From Swiss-Prot:
CC cofactor note: Binds 2 magnesium ions per subunit.
Annotated HAMAP family: Xylose_isom_A (MF_00455)
Top-level taxon of the source organism: Bacteria
Source organism: Thermotoga sp. (strain RQ2)
GO molecular function, one term: magnesium ion binding
One record GO biological process: D-xylose metabolic process
The protein, known as: Xylose isomerase
Signal sequence coordinates: none
Length: 444
């Protein structure tokens, strides 16, 4: 079989002192932490679309990427080559999972029937490669945003025919996700929203979106798909206002339509940025709701107003992200999918590897720091003390629902002074710094 990356060796762990760009400094997949290998804590995944389809095109310029599969001019030959390259890529990086959109892995035909037949051929190739590999599918999804038919949306379109097409496309995507043993299925509504309310039936669109998701739940039950359904919130881009704006908005929608028991969230760092939140905020919201399912690992540029999908290299972000994952009990049917692309000027094949290595190292280091923070309980202890007034006396009565406005007025009306604890933000931020420095110093 053709080798796509002959110049790239299998990536090894060399430790924090290594200067080799094609080696792990902090990620040792077999390092055991809390009784489990690091690779099973992190569950890294390759995003097929950014790694094997993206070619460095932007609105102002042509593709720049040098990719070995581009030697194939026939669309099917290229599709098969990308699949083969995926498995070689994952095996050299010791990544055990991948994610895809249906249209990433196979080209479209003239009709949906023809497209499905093409898709089946590529799925067979993936299944063949899986037989001799430990690479698995983390989650699948359907591309309901690229084709012009979805200009008004998919589930929220003004066309019943387009709604039907989208439903049939998701039906097929669910089938192949199940066939490939996917742990989950993601819904991202890039076109589910509006540009202006002047031409939008907001009520109908939201109701149709709920109808669409309910149909998906029912079909998954029918075919025996037991993977986790995931909503991926994003406030805007490509649509001006998207209905799954953030975790809180999407959860309210699911709750309102009785769908909350079937869905968790796939949280993307850059989407949190676009919503005006920190990555940790979205993860914390999902965690306290019991809905933290999976993560799209990347980072954005705070100076830019769009989804830059950069590889994650910010240790603060990865530490606080993994802190939330640890506090949630870790991943079950989810993981860390690198929804990230190399920069347009990072056009060499080796840059694909370097980008993933950087992200894997940064999350591995973040996990190790977060594990110490969680184990020592430093933030938990401070928070518990800060809110101690609700553990006793009148505060305990408030929490237990044993008081009311009249009783609270009677309690407080003659009190002259209320003593408040200090928030000590500066101390806690410096404590986080100390844990980062200490953890790195202790690593081999």
């Amino acid at each position: 079989m053709m080798e796509f990356f002959p110049e790239i060796p299998k990536i090894q762990f060399e430790g924090k002192e290594s200067t080799n760009p094609l080696a792990f400094k902090f990620y040792d997949p077999n390092e055991v932490i809390d009784g489990k290998p690091l690779k099973d804590h992190l569950k890294f995944s390759v995003a097929f679309w950014h790694t094997f389809v993206n070619e460095g095109r932007d609105p102002f310029g042509d593709p720049t990427a040098e990719r070995p599969w581009n030697r194939f001019s026939d669309p099917m030959d290229k599709a098969f080559a990308r699949v083969d390259a995926l498995f070689e890529f994952c095996e050299k990086l010791n990544i055990e999972y991948f994610c895809f959109h249906d249209r990433d892995i196979a080209p479209e035909g003239k009709t949906l029937r023809e497209t499905n037949k093409i898709l089946d051929k590529v799925v067979e190739r993936i299944k063949e490669r899986m037989k001799d590999s430990n690479v698995k599918l983390l989650w699948g999804t359907a591309n309901l945003f690229s084709h012009p038919r979805y200009m008004h949306g998919a589930a929220t379109t003004c066309s019943a025919d387009v709604f039907a097409y989208a439903a049939a496309q998701v039906k097929k995507a669910l089938e192949i996700t199940k066939e490939l043993g996917g742990e989950g299925y993601v819904f991202w509504g890039g076109r589910e929203g509006y540009e202006t309310l002047l031409n939008t039936d907001l009520g109908l669109e939201l109701e149709n979106l709920a109808r669409f998701l309910r149909m998906a739940v029912e079909y998954a039950k029918k075919i025996g798909f037991t993977g986790q359904f995931l909503i991926e919130p994003k406030p805007k881009e490509p649509t001006k206002h998207q209905y799954d704006f953030d975790v809180a908005t999407a959860y309210a929608f699911l709750k309102n339509h009785g769908l909350d028991e079937y869905f968790k969230f796939n949280i993307e760092a850059n989407h949190a940025t676009l919503a005006g939140h920190t990555f940790q905020h979205e993860l914390r919201m999902a965690r306290i709701l019991g809905k933290l399912g999976s993560i799209d690992a990347n980072q954005g540029d705070l100076l830019l107003g769009w989804d830059t999908d950069q590889f994650p290299t910010n240790i603060y972000d990865t530490t606080l992200a993994m802190y939330e994952v640890i506090k949630a009990g870790g991943f079950t049917k989810g993981g860390l999918n690198f929804d990230a692309k190399v920069r347009r000027a990072s056009y060499k094949v080796e840059d694909l590897f370097i980008g993933h290595i950087a992200g894997m190292d940064t999350f591995a280091l973040g996990f190790k720091i977060a594990y110490k923070l969680a184990k020592d309980g430093v933030f938990d202890k401070f928070i518990e003390e800060k809110y101690r007034s609700f553990k006793e006396g009148i505060g305990k009565e408030i929490v237990e629902g044993k008081t009311d406005f009249e009783k609270l007025e009677e309690y407080i009306i003659d009190k002259e002074d209320i003593e408040l604890p200090s928030g000590k933000q500066e101390y806690l931020e410096s404590l986080l710094n100390s844990y980062i420095v200490k953890t790195i110093a202790e690593l081999r």
